[in-house]
A protein has these predicted regions:
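A short alpha-helical cap/connector motif
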Residues: 1-161, 165-190, 194-208
């Protein structure tokens, strides 16, 4: 999927960033803070902060993220980790898009044993993923009945992360359905919004 996206990136990104993207595909490791995908556990340059150190030492399930996400996640999620450590109530996190299960594994390590971590995916193969303390449910992110059943188990989450289909229509529909269930003071994160510019994901430049 990374290689197939390269022609599109060439059209929409400055040459400098495209070169970084190409280098990463070839296996190089450019400086952190640029726009390029990294496989957590193989890139060992996340240092200086707790979340970065956790990623640097991760040797579990595969997880691919854009490098510039790491600092953003640290800034957004560290207050919830701190509040959770002082509360008797469990932190509740819902992630849309399981893939290989790497990010769910990371969230569990980061927030601790008492955190309630749920992941949803349409891929039946995700049923085979087993992560202690993490629940995975199979269904569509735009199926209201399915989402309601997951929320009935999990409760209203403090953190929602949409890393699912990345399709423009799905992003907006999922937001409409889940936003009313986000706890006051919670955070709703949508990853990879650059797909809003890609026609194959229902987007397009200056599309209304």
């Amino acid at each position: 999927m990374i290689k197939s996206a390269l022609p599109i990136l060439k059209r929409i990104l400055p040459a400098r960033l495209t070169n970084l993207y190409r280098q990463t595909i070839a296996g190089d490791n450019p400086p952190l803070g640029e726009f390029y995908p990294i496989q957590v556990g193989k890139s060992k340059n996340f240092s200086g902060r707790e979340f970065g150190e956790l990623l640097s030492n991760h040797n579990g399930r595969p997880m691919v993220k854009m490098a510039h996400f790491i600092g953003i996640y640290e800034d957004l999620l560290s207050p919830y980790k701190e509040a959770h450590s002082r509360s008797s109530n469990p932190l509740r996190l819902l992630e849309i898009g399981v893939s290989k299960g790497g990010s769910l594994e990371i969230w569990k390590k980061y927030f601790g044993e008492t955190a309630l971590i749920y992941g949803i995916d349409i891929d039946e193969r995700c049923r085979e993923i087993s992560i202690p303390g993490v629940e995975i449910r199979i269904g569509s992110q735009v199926d209201q009945a399915f989402l309601s059943s997951v929320l009935k188990e999990l409760g209203d989450p403090q953190i929602i992360i949409d890393d699912g289909s990345h399709h423009a229509d799905h992003l907006s529909l999922t937001l409409e359905m889940l936003w009313p269930h986000l706890q006051d003071g919670g955070v709703y994160i949508i990853e990879d919004t650059h797909t809003s510019y890609w026609k194959e994901y229902g987007g397009g430049y200056l599309k209304n």
